[in-house]
Amino acid sequence: MDCLITKAEIIEQPYSGQFKERIYDISNQWNSQDWTWIKFEDENYYEWCGQFRGAQRAVALSSKHNQTLVATSDYLFQIDCVSGELTEFKSIDETQTIYQDLTVTPFGDFIIADYYNIELIGETIKDRQHS
């Protein structure tokens, strides 16, 4: 891939062959049967699709950190915007936190919220500040 991801949006399951697809799945006995599809676009306007384990919640891209976060019912995924590689993930099963919304501040940091808490995420998922 090695082109900078410039857009990321949640889409419905694409037709087979419509996009080059990449599966982001974590082996876990508690995984749901749901999937989320994210359409990515790079700086050359090339579109491809990522398939993520769990029902769709939200996606956000930070050009400051060159990271995309994908929140599903099962995981919070962190994708590197240059390589398209999964760099970190957080299992919802471990924390019992079901994220509902995700956005990026004007300063390029992520804000993520569940039903009760708001967190500020910097460069990595581990770099979180609770409010």
What are these regions (language model features)?
Residues N28-Q33, L69-A71, I112:
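Short, solvent-exposed loop/turn segments at conserved positions within beta-propeller repeat blades
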Residues K64-H65, T72-D74, V82, P106-F107, ...:
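Short loop/turn segments that connect beta-strands within the blades of beta-propeller domains
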Residues W35-Q51, L76-E94, Y116-S131:
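Surface-exposed loop/turn elements that mediate protein-protein interactions on large endomembrane-trafficking
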Residues Q33-W35, F40, R53, R57, ...:
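N-terminal accessory interaction module
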Residues D2-S27, E47-N66, D93-G108, S131:
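Repeated scaffold domains used in trafficking and secretory/extracellular systems
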